[in-house]
Amino acid sequence: MRAKLTIVLVVALLVSTLATGCGPAPTPTPVPTAVPPTQVPPTKVPPTPVPPTATPAPTKPPAPAAIEIGASIPLTGKFGSLGAQVKPGYMYAVDAINAAGGVYVKEFDKKIPLKLTIYDDESDPTKAVSKLETLYAEQKVTAYLGGAGSDMHAATAAIAEKNKVPYLGIAFALYQIHQKGYKYLFSPFPKSPAQGKDVYEYLNAQIPEGQRPTKVAIFQEKTDWGIELGGLWKENAPKYGYTIVDYEEYAPGTKDYSGMILKAKAAGAEALFGMPTMPDGTAMFKQMAELGWAPKFSLIIRAPENVAWGDSLGKVGEYVTIFPGWHNGEKFPGVAELNAKYQAEFKRPADLLTGPAYACVQILANAIERAGTLDRDKIRDAIAATNMTTVVGPVTFNADGTGNVLDPLVQWQDGKMELVWPLDQKTADFAYPAPPFNER
């Protein structure tokens, strides 16, 4: 019975299931289809203009208050008489440039005054070296100005080279300084090679053949410059028709020259060439007068370059000639103004070394302006390229730093130093021959 009932229930359940599956399917709830959004092109908005940033003009470095330059000069000691002529030349030139506002330097776009520091080296090369080192370390100088005397410059030029500071110097004729390969040394002043031949050329140009003092005595100082110049006089003599009949050597500071004088007199010397200091030169000529030897022509470089020569020797010092590097009678621009300033202070026209010293500052200022900077190397290059007229006339430089400058011959006449060569610059005629001392 239970089995039948179970079968009936299963059948009923199955029928019910089939009936449900055969009925209509229910309507599904519609699901909205996603419609892609309409693509609207973006509106192009122009960017906000940004004004360009102005490039600032390069700022110039601040200009120094002054252009520092420095000099070591023998104002005392054996070269003191020379240094006394050099110092005013430097100072007057600096004053003149500063009165015009200074030196224009393009790097700073303005004129800057020169500031000159001067030390007295007491004619001592060791002290001169020390002074230049001080100028370099403390004043930080843009350029050096030299002192006076060949052995002084020989010492100081080496310091300029070591420190790579441009150096302008005069009052020295020693050529060998320029043969050391120095790049910072410049000298607008005649050197031994010129003096060693110019004397013969000038004599031959002014004295007729047959009247020339062809027998020459040389009194050579035992110094580097003495050896150099004496050797050139000796070497060049035969080329111009002259003979060296006596060649004497002496140490600086010698007191007795009588032996040398008597030998020259006995050899029949008609001309005397020498390069003594002021004390040696005056002693030499006083003894020549005492011994009665008056050469027809005397070229005595250095000693007679100071007015004290005339004061000390009077007529004994007359007729002597010099190669001083300049004379205040030269007709170049600026000479008259220099003489006027010197006259106001010293009651005479400018001394022989004052003009060349003045020219050094003119050359330096011109070079700084052309360089457009205070860079020492660029100033050095500008000095090397110098081509200008100064109070000593036209100036250019050779590769070794020697200057191409006038080499004037000056002669003592009537208590004054007169310019006798070149002829277009002369202030007096050449006086020749020199009479005996007792006939003056």
Label each PLM-derived region with a short phrase.
Residues L13, G23-A63:
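Ser/Thr-rich, Proline-interspersed low-complexity disordered segments
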Residues T17-G21:
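C-terminal motif of bacterial Sec signal peptides marking the signal peptidase cleavage site
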Residues G70-M91, Y119-P125, A148-D151, F219-E228, ...:
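Extracytoplasmic "Venus flytrap"
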Residues S81-P88, V103-Q179, P188, Y250-Y257, ...:
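Beta-alpha junction/loop-to-helix N-cap segments that form part of ligand/metal-binding clefts
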Residues L82-K106, G231-P238:
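Short, polar/charged alpha-helical segment
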Residues T126, V141-Y247, K296-T321, N328-G329:
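Extracytoplasmic ligand/sensor domains, especially the bilobed periplasmic-binding protein
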Residues F285-Y358, E369, L374, L419, ...:
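Extracellular/periplasmic periplasmic-binding protein-like sensory domains
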Residues A344-T354, A365-W421, Q425:
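Segments of small-molecule ligand-sensing domains
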